Amino acid sequence: MAGAYIVVRIKGQADVPHWAETTLKLLRLEKKHRATIIQSKENTRGMLDKVKHYVAWQEIDAGLAMELLTKRGRGPGYKKLTEKDLEGTDYPGIKELADALATGKASMSKIDRIKPWFALAPPRHGFKRSTKKMYGQKGVLGANRELSELVRSMI
């Protein structure tokens, strides 16, 4: 079983039902093209299943977590994340934090000095698949095996 998932909100804020909006807010995905890393638990899996028509997710590896933290991680004042921002936490550096996030031992919402989400840009050269369909129907939504390449093009 996976230690953690990378979750990216693909669809925007218009015409989203209240129940889905609430779930997306709990996942810290309030805007389009935001990503977060969540631990793989039974309740988070249920939340992902509930909003599968608005987000895409995949198991995350330490390399992608490291890339997200160094390039898109934000600390206090929305400044780039540095080693100094992690002082006073259980993680001496960004690499250790990335490993802990990828294995599910750490949670982004529990670390006070970093933003619990990553603001991504739209993918370079566009989406290769439909943003209106599930992954099994030639789309990008839901459990997506190719999400890591998509996220790398959005960083």
UniProtKB/Swiss-Prot annotation:
Question: What GO biological process terms does the UniProt entry carry, in alphabetical order?
Answer: maturation of LSU-rRNA from tricistronic rRNA transcript (SSU-rRNA, 5.8S rRNA, LSU-rRNA); translation
Which molecular-function annotations from GO does this UniProt entry contain? RNA binding; structural constituent of ribosome
> One Pfam family, short name please?
Ribosomal_L30
Q: Which InterPro entries did the record assign?
A: Ribo_uL30_ferredoxin-like_sf, Ribosomal_uL30, Ribosomal_uL30_arc, Ribosomal_uL30_euk_arc, Ribosomal_uL30_ferredoxin-like
Q: Does the keyword Ribosomal protein apply?
A: yes
Keywords in alphabetical order, please.
Ribonucleoprotein, Ribosomal protein
GO CC annotation terms, alphabetical: cytosolic large ribosomal subunit
Q: Please name the NCBIfam families in this protein's record.
A: PRK06049.1 (NF004711)
Tell me the subunit arrangement: Part of the 50S ribosomal subunit.
Similarity comment: family membership? Belongs to the universal ribosomal protein uL30 family.
Q: What is this protein called?
A: Large ribosomal subunit protein uL30
Q: Organism, per UniProt?
A: Cenarchaeum symbiosum (strain A)
What gene is it encoded by? Answer: rpl30
